Design a protein with these regions (language model features):
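Long, contiguous binding/interaction regions
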Residues: 1-94
C-alpha cells in the first residue's frame, strides 16, 4: 500500500493511544469478515476481537468491515494497514 499516511501526519491528526477506524471492503464469502477482524487482532497482539461492524451492499456482492481497535501509536496504525492489505479477498482498505 503506497498511499498510506506518514507516521508524522497520523501523529498530528490523531491522539494516541486511542481508537482508530479501519475499513476493509471485499466479497462476503469464505470467512472474509473473520479474516479481517483476526488480522487486526493479531497485528495488535490482542486476546479478543476489537469492536467491529459490517455492512453489505444492497445487492450483497460486497461487504464493508469497519474495525475500531484501540491503538498505541501511529506505527500500530501503519502496521494494521499493511496487514489488512495482505488479507485474502480485500479489495480496498482505508
Amino acid at each position: 500500500m503506497d498511499h498510506l499516511p506518514s507516521a508524522e501526519l497520523l501523529d498530528r491528526t490523531h491522539e494516541f493511544p486511542g481508537p482508530y477506524t479501519f475499513k476493509a471492503i471485499g466479497r462476503p464469502e469464505g470467512g472474509f469478515v473473520a479474516r479481517v477482524v483476526a488480522a487486526v487482532r493479531e497485528e495488535l497482539e490482542k486476546d479478543v476481537d476489537p469492536p467491529y461492524r459490517i455492512r453489505e451492499t444492497a445487492a450483497g456482492r460486497h461487504v464493508a468491515v469497519t474495525v475500531e481497535p484501540q491503538v498505541q501509536s501511529a506505527w500500530d496504525v501503519l502496521a494494521v494497514y499493511q496487514r489488512l492489505a495482505q488479507v485474502a479477498g480485500v479489495m480496498f482498505v482505508f
